[in-house]
Each structure stands twice: as C-alpha cells, then as structure tokens.
C-alpha cells in the first residue's frame, strides 16, 4: 500500500455478480445480506454464501481516500472502502487463532460474532462492516455480553451424532436444539446452509439463548439440550457462557455440543466440561485427507490437514480424558460422490483403535446448496455402510437414511 497525505493506493479484492449464474433466489437479500451495498469492501461473505456461485472475485489497484478512526482513544488514518477488520489489522491489531479467547475472526461470514468490537458504542462485527470516517472503536469488550445469531430452538426426535442412541425411541422428543450461524468450513453440500451463512438474523446473548432452550425443554420434556450449527465452537466466550447458563437452569439435563472438531483444543474441551457440557459429538467427516477436502471445500491443503488432524486428535483426547464423564460420539459424511466403501472400512479401523464402543453416526448427505446434482444414498447403501463399520468391530453404529435412523440391531427411529 502506497500512502500520500490523503490517499492510499492499494491492491484489493472486489466481488461482482455473475449475471449468467444469478437466478434471483434472493438469498443475498434475505439471509446473507451485504452491509456495504454501495461499495464492495472485499469481505467475501457473499462470495462464500451464494448457493448458485453467482459471485466472482476480481482484483484491482485502486486509490482510496484516507479516513480517520479512533481505536481505544488513539487516532489513526486508514483507507476507505475496506472492512473494519482489515482496518484494525492495518494498524497492528492482532486477531487470534480461531477458538482462542479474545478477538478472533473464524467465519468471515458475519454469523459467529467472534470478531465483534464496540463500534460507536454498539457491539458489531468487524468482518462484514465497512470502516467509516470518524468511527470510534473500543477493543475492550470484557464487560459487554457476547452475541451470536441463533436459529431455533426446536424439539428433535433423534438428535445429532452424539445423542445417546439408548435415549432415542423415535416417538418422543429427545433433545431441544438450537443451530448457530457461522462456520469455518465451506462445505459445498452444507446441510444447514440457511443457518451457516445467516448474517442478518437477530443475535442473542448466551442467557437469552439458554432461557429459550430451557423453555423448549420444559414444554417438550426432553432429556437433552443440543447446540449445533454452523459451527458452535467459533465464538468461545459465547459458547462457554451458554453452557454455564444452561447448567444453572437445567442441573440434571444432558447438555450436548455438536461440533466439527476443527478448532477444539484440550483446554477448550476442559473448559466446556467444566461449564457443564456432558455430551460431545465430533465430526471428522472422512478417513482420508483428500476426501475431507472434497467434503469441506477447504482447498488449502495445509489448512485442511490441520483441521482434519485436529478433529481426529480431539476425538481421541475426549475418549482418553472424559469417557467416564461425557457421552461421546463421532460423525461421518457419506456419499458415493466422495467416499468409497474401502474408506468406510478405514474409518471403522481408526475409530476401533480409539474405542470400539464409541457411538458412530454416519449421515447420508443429500443434494443441497452448491451440490444439488449429487444423489442421496439409498437405504440399502447406508445399511452396507453400517455393516462394514460393524464388521470392523464397532459396537454402536447409527446410519441416517431417508426413512429414518437405523442403529444397533437394525432398530429404527
């Protein structure tokens, strides 16, 4: 970036609409909404969110006027036409690794609110909001309640990958669940993309979310409460406070976290358990890195390997450290588009080496979002997946099918 007294010349990314692909689905007007429609700031949220991939990134060299912002009482000159996050990075503010305590920016979609700071006195996201002349920013938000976009709650009859199968009968409700916005993965067949890419919903504090979940549990008399997404672990402070509130309001209820496991660390898991979470599901998704990259849409091989390795590693840590305190489950994403039966067997061997008693749930990924062309696996196909895993020694295998979930002994729910 070259600076003059009042202008900055910089190379920047901008997103434009590919009119040939746009079908006017209005996803960008109702769910993932631009916060700077008059001037693209290159946050890329709409690029990742468009179901029809009708967004293109172009790079250009531009001149932007310098504007003044105040951060923690100190005045800075930054280029106009960029996000608050980029402006903060340009003046040396550090965004910590995803899953850390403090300021992070793990989703870059506007859903998780982990990047939020006080902007002109209001808690707001830095990743999708444009920097403005005269903006006053405070990085000290320790006394401000965290926020996150939440969908639900709703009662569920089956639950998620770690919902104890012995509680599921297919008739009564087993969990009251919420789904939180934002994710660090870019799965082209995201099964909850309307949640994952939501940056326009009203955010809730942890206590507000806990109160709604507790009310839902009371109405439907569910033995469990679940938090899914999107990816719940992106906003650490919000999630820990949520579980603390839930445990306070529901002292005897099973509290279930459904996570992809990519950014969970041992100390993060310890903090979750201490906060009252006693049911954790981790989804390594695949047995091979190449398959994982296909499923998650993470094209950076080193980043994909980091996420993939961590999800398996944290599953091992959970089993080794908390088998007596936490009900643990593992999840995998099956579709013949990306996974062979040979890889299914490899997954079985890897899980068996950790603990053959570990509950394993295999989801039959269906066509949606950007992979509308794939075919949903048949019931027979999923039963074969189940048989392969059981032949590798696994004791509790559940497969999701179009007719319902099928578990040990081929009991359906």
Annotate each language-model stretch with its function.
Residues 1-14, 20, 42-92, 146-153, ...:
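Flanking helices and flexible, charged tails adjoining ferredoxin-like Fe-S electron-transfer domains
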Residues 14, 21-41, 45-61, 114-124, ...:
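Iron-sulfur cluster-binding cysteine motifs and their immediate structural context
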Residues 382-413:
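A cross-taxonomic marker for long C-terminal extensions/tails that follow the last structured domain
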Residues 339-343, 373-377, 408-413:
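Short glycine/threonine-rich loop-to-helix capping motif typified by GTGT followed
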């Amino acid at each position: 970036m070259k600076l003059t007294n009042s202008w900055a010349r910089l190379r920047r990314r901008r997103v434009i609409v590919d009119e040939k692909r746009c079908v006017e689905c209005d996803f960008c007007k109702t769910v993932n909404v631009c916060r700077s429609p008059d001037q693209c700031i290159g946050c890329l949220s709409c690029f990742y969110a468009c179901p029809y991939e009708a967004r293109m990134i172009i790079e250009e060299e531009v001149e932007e006027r310098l504007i003044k912002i105040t951060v923690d009482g100190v005045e800075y000159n930054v280029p106009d036409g960029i996000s608050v996050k980029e402006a903060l990075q340009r003046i040396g503010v550090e965004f910590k690794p995803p899953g850390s305590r403090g300021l992070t920016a793990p989703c870059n979609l506007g859903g998780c609110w982990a990047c939020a700071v006080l902007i002109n006195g209001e808690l707001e996201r830095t990743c999708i909001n444009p920097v403005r002349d005269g903006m006053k920013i405070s990085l000290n938000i320790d006394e401000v309640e965290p926020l996150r976009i939440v969908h639900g709650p709703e009662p569920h009859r089956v639950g998620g990958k770690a919902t104890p199968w012995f509680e599921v009968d297919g008739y009564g409700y087993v969990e009251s669940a919420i789904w939180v916005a934002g994710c660090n993965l870019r799965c082209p067949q995201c099964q909850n993309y309307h949640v994952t890419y939501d940056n326009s919903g009203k955010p809730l504090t942890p206590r507000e979310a806990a109160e709604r979940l507790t009310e839902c549990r009371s109405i439907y008399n569910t033995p469990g409460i679940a938090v899914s997404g999107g990816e719940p672990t992106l906003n650490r402070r919000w999630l820990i406070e949520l579980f603390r509130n839930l445990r306070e309001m529901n002292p005897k209820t099973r509290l279930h976290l459904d996570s992809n496991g990519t950014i969970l660390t041992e100390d993060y898991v310890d903090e979750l358990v201490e906060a009252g979470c006693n049911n954790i599901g981790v989804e390594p998704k695949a047995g091979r890195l190449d398959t994982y990259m296909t499923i998650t849409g993470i094209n950076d091989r080193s980043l994909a390997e980091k996420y993939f390795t961590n999800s398996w590693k944290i599953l091992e840590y959970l089993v080794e450290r908390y088998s007596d305190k936490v009900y643990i489950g593992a999840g995998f994403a099956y579709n013949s588009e990306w996974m062979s039966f040979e890889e299914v067997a490899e997954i079985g061997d890897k899980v068996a080496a950790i603990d053959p008693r570990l509950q394993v749930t295999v989801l039959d990924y269906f066509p949606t979002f950007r992979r509308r062309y794939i075919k949903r696996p048949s019931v027979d196909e999923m039963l074969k997946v189940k048989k392969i895993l059981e032949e590798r020694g696994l004791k509790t295998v559940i497969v999701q099918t179009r007719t319902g979930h099928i578990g040990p002994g081929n009991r359906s729910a």
